[in-house]
């Protein structure tokens, strides 16, 4: 993914307008763990940017004709991941959108490649304690149907964080008003896309996207 500068006609525009112009037809993709707030923040971010919001999990359920827990139970996780990759590819091909991805979507190489090509990615980074508090009462998380959900969450974070960290922008997901986090997303997008500032790990090349070799 490449840092952008806005055209002179964008000077004086609101940050939201400038970000959409700098996206130049690309989508925004929110990545991160279950319970990080990707759908909640994504809807509000899309409204602020006047872009269409799409929840990948909802689209997967629509395409499969069954809820995600049933897909896992009936067909297994590999089958689910295959369908997830196809749905995300279709959605990104039809962009620009604000896309909330599933927690494990970026585990697939082809999905990481598609996100790097067609989207600017935002990692909503949440601590294990925050995630557990948000999801512990929900029965629609098949990967948490274990004897020790807290240990499962910590294991998944450890496995996935090296990939999440490759996102273009990182925003801490914590228990503050949603609009604060949306404001941070827009501010960081504006700095990265419109002012050419690096907003992720300072050691990382700003032209890099998701590593598709992992």
UniProtKB/Swiss-Prot annotation:
* Chief location category: cytoplasm
Q: Which cofactors does it use?
A: Mg(2+)
The annotated pathway is: Metabolic intermediate biosynthesis; chorismate biosynthesis; chorismate from D-erythrose 4-phosphate and phosphoenolpyruvate: step 5/7
A Pfam family: SKI
Question: What's in the keyword line of the UniProt record?
Answer: Amino-acid biosynthesis, Aromatic amino acid biosynthesis, ATP-binding, Cytoplasm, Kinase, Magnesium, Metal-binding, Nucleotide-binding, Transferase
Q: Which reaction does it catalyse?
A: shikimate + ATP = 3-phosphoshikimate + ADP + H(+)
Q: Which residues does the record give as ATP binding sites?
A: 35-40, 141
Q: Into which family does the record put it?
A: Belongs to the shikimate kinase family.
- Protein name as annotated: Shikimate kinase
List the subcellular locations: Cytoplasm
């Amino acid at each position: 993914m490449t840092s952008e500068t806005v055209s002179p006609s964008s000077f004086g525009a609101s940050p939201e307008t400038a970000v959409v112009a700098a996206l130049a037809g690309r989508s925004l993709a929110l990545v991160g763990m279950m319970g990080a707030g990707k759908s909640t923040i994504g809807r509000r971010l899309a409204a602020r940017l006047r872009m269409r919001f799409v929840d990948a999990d909802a689209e997967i359920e629509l395409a499969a004709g069954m809820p995600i827990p049933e897909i896992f139970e009936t067909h297994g996780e590999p089958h689910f991941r295959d369908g997830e990759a196809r749905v995300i590819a279709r959605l990104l091909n039809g962009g620009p959108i604000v896309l909330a991805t599933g927690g494990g979507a970026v585990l697939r190489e082809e999905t990481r490649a598609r996100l790097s090509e067609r989207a600017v990615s935002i990692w909503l980074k949440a601590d294990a304690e925050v995630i557990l508090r948000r999801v512990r009462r929900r029965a629609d998380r098949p990967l948490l149907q274990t004897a020790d959900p807290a240990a499962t969450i910590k294991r998944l974070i450890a496995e996935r964080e090296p990939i999440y960290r490759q996102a273009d922008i990182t925003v801490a997901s914590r228990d503050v008003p949603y609009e604060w986090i949306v404001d941070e997303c827009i501010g960081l997008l504006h700095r990265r896309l419109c002012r050419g500032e690096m907003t992720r790990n300072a050691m990382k090349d700003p032209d890099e996207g998701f590593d598709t070799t992992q």
